[in-house]
């Protein structure tokens, strides 16, 4: 699946597929993730969180408060949330990268040793459908839908 995602996404500006950092590593790619450049414009990003909050508070990555205060200090960028919402509308389930543990309410008072990497990845990352039942045709459809959600002007 990763090889096909890599091939189909290689020329999509603003999207980077996570891969092995060097030949010393050999990922099993049980989860394929992409990073969206913060400058990448995605259809609907101006209202991405508004639409999600209206649907279900807590449904958006990082939303943990009532709708009057729907944003937190650690949430995916609007273009990531807009891509997730856009893919969902096309029948594709995706999700933000995991929210850093030290930013989750249950761990807010626990000691944490952080350097900012987990927060920065959470803001720009999106998990794509992966696994043995994701066919080549599925991957092609997913990438096509990603492209359709990008504003190219």
Predicted regions and their residues:
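PLP-dependent aminotransferase class I/II
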Residues: 1-153
């Amino acid at each position: 699946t990763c090889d096909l995602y890599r091939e189909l996404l290689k020329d999509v500006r603003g999207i980077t597929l996570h891969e092995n950092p060097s030949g010393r590593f050999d990922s099993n790619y049980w989860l394929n993730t992409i990073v969206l450049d913060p400058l990448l414009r995605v259809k609907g990003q101006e209202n991405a969180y508004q639409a999600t909050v209206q649907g279900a508070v807590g449904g958006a990555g990082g939303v943990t408060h009532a709708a009057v205060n729907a944003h937190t200090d650690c949430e995916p960028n609007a273009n990531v949330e807009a891509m997730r919402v856009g893919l969902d509308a096309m029948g594709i389930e995706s999700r933000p990268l995991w929210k850093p543990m030290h930013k989750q309410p249950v761990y807010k008072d626990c000691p944490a040793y952080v350097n900012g990497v987990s927060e920065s990845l959470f803001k720009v990352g999106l998990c794509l459908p992966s696994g043995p039942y994701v066919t080549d045709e599925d991957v092609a459809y997913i990438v096509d839908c990603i492209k359709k959600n990008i504003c190219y002007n």
